[in-house]
Amino acid sequence: GMDLELLDWLNAHTFPEEAKYADLSYAALAYGQFVDCLRRSATTRAVVFGTVHPAATTLLMELLEASGLVSYVGKVNMDRDCPEALREADAAASLAATEQWLASARFAHAKPILTPRFVPSCSDALLQGLGELAARRGLPVQSHLSENLGEIALVQSPCPQTDFYAEAYDRCGLLSQPCIMAHCVHCPPEEQDLLQARGVFIAHSPLSNSNLSSGIAPVSAYLARGLRVGLGSDLAAGETENLFRVMAEAIRVSKLR
């Protein structure tokens, strides 16, 4: 799927794969392999997107807990503009499934993190509800931001009242909690100002950004202005769990800007 950009890649490969995790036997096999690979790599801390399925996401947390790794794991929320097999009925159903998952997500080292996939697949009501849940329970948040130009254009249609992508999260309170935003490849200056003001942590994912032709994040500029930036492998758009490979790619692509 590396011949596709983000949105086409999601529809052609990622969403069909994620739909399979409704089957717990499949989820156990796939997540077992993932956790084993992670354990064998140089990674000891991970922040992970699950799928929309509460039971499968809890299973992933159980496997990570047993591995000895320290992690944050998110049950994904999506109630619009995604395949029917993954689309939750509405905001209320998505929030109820999240509460169900949180009730079972009680581990010493695998912690929950709220995970709206991205603005295009989440209604305003869902984003607002997740923001309220984050504030009420003191939970961190992770999502995607300004990864791809097509994605950014897609946000403008359902959110005409916002001047830039991150405002759609911020007006729902999702940047007010401890927050990780993946990618941030195409953040305009005013978006960078907001991320800095809210203390958002950027997960720079150079392997996946190269593989999906998303662009090269201006990480040196982000660091110079005091933004917090770390590295992410972003499986499976990134092809390895090994963060040493990610470090090498970050250096390599930074020379091309």
Give the residues covered by each predicted segment:
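Long hydrophobic segments that form regular secondary structure
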Residues: 187-200, 205-211
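Metal-coordinating catalytic core of metallo-dependent amide/deamination hydrolases
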Residues: 55-185
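C-terminal helical cap
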Residues: 31-38, 201, 209-211, 255-257
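His/Asp/Glu-enriched, well-ordered alpha-helical/loop segment
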Residues: 171-178, 220-257
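Short, acidic/turn-prone active-site loops that include or flank metal/cofactor-
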Residues: 76-79, 147, 206-210, 235-237
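Hydrophobic residues within beta-strands of alpha/beta enzymes
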Residues: 46-47, 141, 230
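Divalent metal-coordination and catalytic microenvironments
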Residues: 42, 64, 114, 144, ...
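Alpha-helical scaffold segments that flank or form the walls of functional sites
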Residues: 2-69, 94-107
